[in-house]
Amino acid sequence: MLGRTLINKHGFLIHPRRFVHLNDKSLDGTFILPSKKNHMYDVPTNDLSGILNASDIDRINNLPFFDNTSPTKETNTKEGALLSEKLASVKELFGEDLENPSFINYRFPRGLENPYFDIQVNQLKKKRLSVTQLCTTQNWCELRNFYDFYSQNLSNQLLNLKFQVQKGKKIHKSLEDETHPELNQYKSFTHNFLALTKLSMDIDNDMDALLDNWFNSINRLVSLFTKGDGHAREIVCHGFINLEDGKLVEHLLNSDSKTKENVIISGVIDHLTLRNKHNHQVQKGAAHLDTEYQSWGNILTNLLSNLKELKSNNEIVISDIKTRSVPKIPSIESVIESSKLQTMYYKFFFSHLSQDMTQTYHSFLINAKRRGLDVDAPINPTKILTFILTNPLFANDVKNLLYGLPINHSAFDNDAKGSNTFDMAAFNDLLDRGPTSFNVPIEQDEDSSESTKCVSLRDYGHFYTKWKTPLTLKYFAARLSQIYFIVGNLVSNDLMIEYYYHNDNFHNIIFPYDTLKLGTHAHDSAMVWFGGRDMHPIEPTQKNFNTYCKFCDYRHVCSWKNKNELKLIDLGKELKKIILESSMK
């Protein structure tokens, strides 16, 4: 009788065993009978009159309280339905704790390889991890985080329903739009241009996403030194971590066949600030370059030749932006520490990508190949035409490919020809049908209010032919390797977390880069992702349960929490007994 679990007709779960927790929830979403004060009631095991039998359950069923019960509001909402589905999914995968039936096991499922292969490779088809995934293993409760990782689709849907998550995304987007308005302008132009010309942009989604990220990163980092306001946002970066020893890879080989044991770690940097190294004032147009009639290549050559001087007076600060629901920084130190580590990874990646331009070139190509992309395949001509029409620096730069000229990047120039062709001749037809003039977005000068200019397709007629050097991802990897070499050499050892409440940057934390701390964290995170250790739940103290578990989706079904809370109650009773006995002596 003591090991049985009884459920009344209303779905309320009753455990007729010692220390029944009367404010818990079972895995299937039903509730254990709650009390007013959330106390744990001791059912004395040596007194059978204290054990509920079938007659007792029947009396409980007929209490007036149950006549007015109804499903909780949570289960009547989309969020509640997703939560129930997620809990069921996690329970099915992890199984019940055999020592504590009805509660989820807190060890990795047997029969599976490890979280990296289970989640990233097999479930999501992504042969990579993210900086966020490495940093969130220990920022709160590792147990909760891996329950979420294994139910990623449902967890993400739940997150997207939360107001604060949506608010945070909007703040990030508004900051990006303020610094880089050309992105929305480009999207608007492209939409109208395709509709008017009846052109289609048939391009693989993964290729399109990577191409946009690479193009925008080059453009934004170049602008950091030219007409920019000293800021760049949403910049991609990556590095590698060894699958066997969990160490961050400091030196890359040029061939992917020699780096199979290295897993890509990708990230997106929220904010880069170019500032004077001595007075910390933000630098605008630090390179003093006139971009008219210039190209990406010319600007990069100039920056490379003046890098020593730039480095003596300037530095770039990496920041991570965190949004808050109240104007206060987190009270949990592990959350702040996780944010610090996130920026340390970015600093490490930029340092790694600034060692050698040839290695960095191959590193970006390995990144693309691991995503299943063909780095030798010509890029969709319509996509390139929209870049040419909206970005003069790019248009002037790719003339080198059009005419088969070198771009002054030795690895690319020796590697670029290939057997594929890149042909834009079909666009000659546009000159004989439909409109040929369009308003395109331009970068605004301080003394000009014009945001667009009129361009004619006829002015770009020289591009509408077969190019002598195909335009592939290799070209973008080459330009990325140059600008990342420049930026990486300027990255400061001072890192920053920016806290925002609504659109107000109410607090910043500046801290130093710590190589040893980063290496230790990377190894520990890698061990759990690659199967070297099990999950580490939070330390079982009542304070931790009150702090970490209060809003956790798994708080009613977590065996770790349930078992240890019972132990704490037992301990409390024992201490009370000892104190009582001591006082009676």
Swiss-Prot record:
Keywords tagged on the record: 4Fe-4S, DNA-binding, Exonuclease, Hydrolase, Iron, Iron-sulfur, Magnesium, Metal-binding, Mitochondrion, Nuclease, Transit peptide
Name one process (GO BP) from the record. Answer: mitochondrial genome maintenance
Which EC class is this protein assigned?
Answer: hydrolase
Cofactor(s) needed by this chain:
Mg(2+); [4Fe-4S] cluster
Entry-linked InterPro entries = Exo5 (IPR016610), EXOV (IPR019190)
Q: Transit peptide located at which residues?
A: 1-26
Q: Which EC number(s) are documented for this chain?
A: 3.1.-.-
Details of cofactor binding: Binds 1 [4Fe-4S] cluster.
| Record-level Gene Ontology MF annotations | 4 iron, 4 sulfur cluster binding; DNA binding; metal ion binding; single-stranded DNA 5'-3' DNA exonuclease activity
Q: Where does [4Fe-4S] cluster bind?
A: C141, C549, C552, C558
Q: Which GO terms describe its cellular component?
A: mitochondrion; nucleus
Please provide an example of a Pfam family that matches this protein in its UniProt record: Exo5
Q: Where in the cell is it found?
A: Mitochondrion
- What main location does UniProt list? mitochondrion
Task: Fill in the subunit field for this protein.
Answer: Monomer.
Q: What family, per the record?
A: Belongs to the EXO5 family.
Purpose of the protein: Single strand DNA specific 5' exonuclease involved in mitochondrial DNA replication and recombination. Releases dinucleotides as main products of catalysis. Has the capacity to slide across 5'double-stranded DNA or 5'RNA sequences and resumes cutting two nucleotides downstream of the double-stranded-to-single-stranded junction or RNA-to-DNA junction, respectively.
What is the name listed in the Swiss-Prot or TrEMBL entry for this protein?
Exonuclease V, mitochondrial
